[in-house]
Amino acid sequence: MSIFSRRLQVPLPYVIAGFFIALIAIFVLASHLFTDKTWFGKEGLLWLFALGAVPGLVVALAQFILNWVEFGEISRIKRLGVQNMLLTRDDPNYYGKYMGQARQKINVMGVTSARFFQDFADVESPLERKKILLAALDRNVQVKILIPSSKHLQERHKEGFRVTKERCQRLKKEYPSLFDARLFDHEAVQALVQIDNEVIVGPVFPNKESKNTPVIHVSAESVFAQSYLDNFESEWNAAAPIDEE
């Protein structure tokens, strides 16, 4: 019969509440049947029940308060649009899963972005995950690269700048209406990657590799992200084409 193949779906809170009600009912029934104590007498069943239940209720209340405070803190962070925090930026898989789903734009701001091209635009690699940026361009995703001019780079970054410039020039020729790269006229102070509605941003320290610095992942619609995105647009509008250097 079809009735035996049906599944009954019950919300978990109802199951938990029903379990405790049944447990209390069993306790009350057992106390009434297997003891000679009355409910309201001196040290009766009600007193024994309260003596056992009150400490548990106090502990449960304390735990509830702690959880409520923690929930409030998490909610406050969520309202800021924070989705994740990473100790380092050296995880191409984290960026790659969003870039593989990009439909509108990818904006990148950093020191040289050499590692970005190595991870996602390696035309010689047989691995598709190394060509995620190229696949995004093939899907008509707009890509902007914004880095400082070479005169604002330390000597150890000059080679990375040269490689990035060559790759940007090649991509600009292949995707003239989709790809663009520009240079701003000061040292880099932040690293930013925007992939549609996802923004991953962090600081740039002069004497520390950017891949080893922390970042925060937020929604592009959040107030937190808006300042960084406004700064990117301002820097982009004032920057010079990478071909001019």
Residue ranges and their predicted role:
Residues 180-220:
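HKD (HxKxxxxD) catalytic microenvironment of the phospholipase D
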Residues 38-76:
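Transmembrane alpha-helices and immediately adjacent membrane-cytoplasm interface residues
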Residues 27-38:
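Juxtamembrane "helix-exit" motif on the non-cytosolic side of transmembrane helices
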Residues 42, 206-245:
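Signature of lipid phosphatidyltransferase scaffolds
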Residues 18-28, 54-57, 106:
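Hydrophobic alpha-helical transmembrane segments of multi-pass integral membrane proteins
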Residues 148-190:
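HKD-type phospholipase D/PLD-like phosphodiesterase module
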Residues 1-22:
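Juxtamembrane interface helix immediately N-terminal to a transmembrane segment
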Residues 65-153, 234, 241:
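PLD-like (HKD) phosphodiesterase/transphosphatidyltransferase domain
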